[in-house]
């Protein structure tokens, strides 16, 4: 049948007698057979970027520039992959099938000033991130999400803001104003399908308490977010700096808040409150990083119990099902850390 390019979702479609059917793109399967860790497998490459070390490390309070890599389909420890342009914590990441972006953050210490820069790397190679020469609209920490063409950054802190910025991943440029979240909040989580981006939870301003709000935007347009529903399982304290993974249809929010193992999920294309998915294996607080394929989500790091120790464990879930998380492996051994920024070349938004 006839072909067309659907600019709303950034995909090619074919006419099937009575409807347009999407032609699915494929992410390149990456891996390094010389490795004996997770990255030795072939499949979706996930990147955990930056973070900072907490007690009892003698370097506690310092951010770092290391980026870890895993193959999402292969259990095992991460490998040292490449480096950010500086030592940052709290930045946001997003990616299409070939390029990863890192934006914002704070460094080189946890008390340093904020960074507005947008940097990028080629996911298939181990070359370091490069400075794009372009910036976010403000220099703050944030969370990122994307479809195959457009990256969004929001849930800013320092100060808390309702701003949403966007960039075109392959052409870059300074971030443009997309719209606003339904409330001012920072430390929220973001997931996406090819059509929608959804923000969930965070810390509200001016109360400085966790919020359970979920709101969404349509990625191909610009405009303010609309109410989606609420995070139900963490309704008492909200959720912030949690793990966030997604398939093309389902978003999953894992842990975070004030020491919680709770995992919630929601269907991205609809609206409504979240439902209980299961529990994480390790009890942690906030500061989690996460990466995913269309079927598996990997959640890593965080603040351990007792605080302020950080943990280097990774655990995984199967996104289309429900159930408890299972041990995946560890972030590289020297890095007991809070990654916060994760992305992959095969997530459900592509």
Where are these regions (language model features)?
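Polar, enzyme-active/binding microenvironments
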Residues: 2-350
